Amino acid sequence: MSKTLYERLGGANGIARIVDDVVEAHMNNPLIKARFVPLLERPDHLAAAKKHLRDFLGMGGGGPEKYSGRSMPDTHRGMNISAQEYMAAIDDILATLDKHKVDEQTRKDVLAIAYSLKGEIVHV
């Protein structure tokens, strides 16, 4: 039996490390950091955002987590995220997966999820 995406990402602990590193990468990315740095002023919001990301990726990857956050359109509505910003975020995700030595098929699976959400994030 093949492993789930959740298992291939290292389960809850692996996903938590990946989420932490992706958020850090976003905060250092000149194209999108203005959207993330304000979270540093609200540690409670930063913690909640990371939890939602962990739960979203965990549930989507076949893990036991339950995502209880808003829908992607509701979360991103009014932010006017450009395609360039979206791709900058994708680049951060891919670089983080490389950092964690995630195999190519798992990278493709994560990328497929990310691309499937593009219409719910960009210019909504």
Name the predicted role of every residue range.
Residues 1-124:
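Core of compact, soluble alpha-helical bundle domains
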